[in-house]
């Protein structure tokens, strides 16, 4: 599908769209209906990604990319400053042209390690760099690395790599890399019944084995924990493989508690909880039984080990300290979404965010059985106030079916972002996020839309995370089914609540959300025997796919398509009916397609096919290519083009 003809057409589309934006490219302001939106002030006011901050294990260094042109890699020494604008550039390469994932500073050898690629194409390898010289070493040459970690001494790295893939089948290998000699040893190749795909690794203190996650028959809904013996290369599954557990709800906790005892997380009871494993006896024991997903790391205070835990929900985050048996010593709720980054002694380090909090770093100290919270890293008040242009209104929206837990109509959580300065009533717009919504987190795209005076609906349809394993699994094998009905109900509810007619309601989303946008715009009116409709006025589909079966065979993560949609062979008819390419004649309004030409996760052909089909039908469609970009768009120039194109499209529709 990636032919010269197609790329030429896409580049022409991009050139046309870019030329229409060129006059105001420098000042960064975009004319939108009754106002100008200073998009560039958002991009320069906070030239980072809210999720792209990486804290070293010892909490002394913060690594992040800055969205300049070019986009450098920056390190902030937290022992000297807590102002992220004062970070030192440690690599002046243009990191907008490559991926930088899971970095970790090794204080033992002074190198920074990460997994990434060289051209945003997700050929993921393991790298390290000397921050003093910028010299970089690539240790591997494989199609994909799923996960990696250090040992306790930090003189070895463990990683699982995809070695070969033919169609849906692939082979993964577990490797041990000696960081001093650079000797790379293959420990084992995985088994067809339990693949090491998307693994996490926690090595034992004596480096004789590890806990890792494995997928039964490459099925993300049957994620298990296994113990791997390095000497024999054999691994034994220690959780019940007959019980469902999700990939997102299972994890290993590093370091181990002791020489023979390790802790891990599993949501096989419905929520991610803590369990312990004794490799000497083989015993697995439940430690916690919360009805809320949990994350945990070890904490030390007064010479004892404790579990530092955090549970998040739209209402906030519960931080609790537990003893090794799971007894809760103290718990505090904080009105933000907290991500536990590391622990040092009795201190927990979190990144914090909310719909109105861009980025903070917190320290929560466990002292005398109590928690003491303070903000370590924050932004200046003038930046914070200028970057928030709306307030969040929490909604509970009824959908079409009955929740078996309550016996009543299922209610969906959502946030409505209400602009400080809305458009006049006769110009009012509502933007509906098609998927991945409902988080209590800052979203720059939402704030740019509300700066333009538009309302933004961020809802959590079935399949969303944050509400337990079972809710997240409700859309498994039902892509484009009941999740789509949920979003139609949400859009109609808020459209009527605000008095904004459907022709001024648009949907937008990326990846799964890009597909869902295409699906909502071309919805045939019935799925799973249920009839409903909502005539969206326009849509913005980013990195989406229009043909589920084609996507399955052209993605570097085909197991995702299999889980979400179904078997492309035995369920072909269903998958084709759920594919927007099958219903182009029913599109309800103009559609803007945006895609990176280096995207290996969702191939650009998925947008090209829909563009061609809509053009053939005489339907209004536009196509922007993000040159040199993968599954996400980096760099200020790329982001200016992205937002300018979207705002111009919405204003014209």
Q: Where do the model's predicted regions map?
A:
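Serine-hydrolase catalytic core recognition
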Residues: 337-653
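Conserved beta-propeller blade repeats
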Residues: 47-65, 94-112, 142-163, 189-216, ...
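Beta-propeller domains
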Residues: 64-93
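Short loop/turn segments that connect beta-strands within beta-propeller blades
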Residues: 78-81, 130-134, 178-182, 229-233, ...
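Bacterial signal peptide processing site
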Residues: 22-24
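C-terminal motif of bacterial Sec signal peptides marking the signal peptidase cleavage site
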Residues: 18-20
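Short, solvent-exposed loop/turn segments at conserved positions within beta-propeller repeat blades
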Residues: 68-71, 119-124, 165-172, 217-223, ...
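A short helix->beta-strand "capping" segment at the edge of beta-propeller domains
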Residues: 27-48, 87
């Amino acid at each position: 599908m990636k032919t010269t003809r197609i790329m030429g057409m896409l580049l022409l589309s991009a050139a046309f769209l870019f030329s229409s934006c060129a006059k105001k490219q420098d000042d960064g302001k975009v004319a939108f209906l009754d106002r100008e939106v200073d998009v560039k002030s958002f991009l320069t006011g906070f030239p980072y990604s809210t999720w792209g901050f990486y804290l070293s294990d010892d909490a002394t260094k913060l690594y992040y990319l800055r969205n300049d042109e070019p986009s450098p890699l920056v390190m902030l020494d937290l022992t000297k400053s807590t102002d992220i604008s004062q970070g030192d550039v440690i690599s002046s390469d243009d990191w907008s042209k490559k991926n930088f994932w899971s970095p970790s500073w090794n204080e033992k050898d002074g190198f920074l390690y990460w997994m990434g690629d060289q051209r945003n194409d997700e050929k993921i390898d393991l790298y390290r760099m000397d921050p003093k010289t910028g010299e970089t070493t690539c240790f591997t040459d494989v199609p994909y690395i799923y996960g990696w970690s250090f040992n306790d001494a930090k003189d070895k790295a463990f990683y699982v790599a995809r070695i070969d893939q033919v169609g849906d089948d692939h082979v993964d290998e577990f490797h041990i890399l000696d960081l001093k000699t650079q000797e790379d040893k293959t420990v084992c190749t995985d088994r067809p019944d339990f693949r090491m795909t998307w693994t996490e690794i926690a090595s034992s203190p004596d480096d004789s084995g590890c806990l890792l996650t494995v997928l039964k028959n490459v099925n993300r809904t049957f994620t298990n924990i296994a113990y791997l013996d390095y000497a024999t290369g054999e691994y034994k599954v220690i959780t019940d493989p007959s019980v469902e557990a999700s990939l997102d709800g299972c994890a290993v906790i590093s370091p181990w508690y002791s020489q023979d005892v390790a802790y891990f997380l599993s949501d096989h009871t419905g929520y991610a909880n803590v369990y312990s494993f004794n490799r000497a006896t083989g015993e697995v024991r439940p430690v916690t039984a919360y009805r809320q997903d949990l994350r945990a790391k070890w904490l030390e205070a007064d010479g004892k080990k404790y579990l530092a835990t955090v549970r998040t929900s739209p209402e906030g985050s519960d931080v609790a300290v537990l003893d090794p048996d799971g007894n809760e010593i103290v718990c505090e709720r904080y009105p933000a979404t907290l991500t536990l980054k590391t622990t040092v002694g009795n201190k927990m380090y979190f990144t914090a965010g909310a719909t109105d909090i861009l980025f903070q770093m917190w320290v929560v100290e466990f002292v005398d059985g109590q928690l003491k919270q303070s903000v370590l890293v924050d932004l200046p008040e003038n930046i914070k106030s200028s970057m928030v242009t709306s307030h969040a209104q929490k909604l509970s929206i009824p959908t079409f079916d009955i929740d078996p837990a309550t016996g009543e109509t299922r209610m969906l959580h959502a946030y409505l972002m209400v602009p400080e300065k809305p458009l006049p009533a006769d110009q009012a717009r509502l933007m509906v996020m098609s998927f991945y919504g409902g988080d209590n987190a800052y979203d720059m795209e939402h704030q740019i839309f509300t700066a333009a005076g538009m309302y933004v609906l961020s809802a959590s349809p079935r399949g969303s995370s944050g509400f337990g394993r079972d809710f997240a699994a409700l859309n498994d094998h039902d892509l484009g089914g009941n999740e789509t009905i949920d979003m139609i109900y949400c859009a109609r509810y808020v459209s009527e609540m605000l008095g904004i007619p459907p022709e001024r309601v648009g949907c937008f989303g990326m990846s799964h959300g890009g597909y869902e946008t295409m699906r909502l715009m071309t919805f045939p009116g019935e799925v799973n025997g249920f009839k409903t409709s909502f005539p969206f006025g326009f849509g913005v589909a980013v990195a989406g796919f229009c043909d589920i079966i084609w996507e399955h065979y052209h993605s570097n993560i085909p197991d995702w398509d299999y889980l979400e949609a179904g078997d492309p062979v035995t369920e072909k008819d269903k998958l084709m009916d759920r594919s927007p390419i099958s219903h182009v004649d029913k599109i309800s309004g103009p559609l803007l397609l945006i895609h990176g030409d280096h995207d290996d996760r969702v191939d650009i052909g998925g947008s090209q096919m829909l563009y061609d089909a809509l053009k053939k039908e005489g339907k209004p469609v536009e196509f922007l290519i993000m040159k040199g970009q993968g599954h996400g768009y980096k760099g200020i120039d790329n982001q200016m083009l992205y937002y300018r194109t979207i705002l111009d499209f919405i204003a014209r529709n």
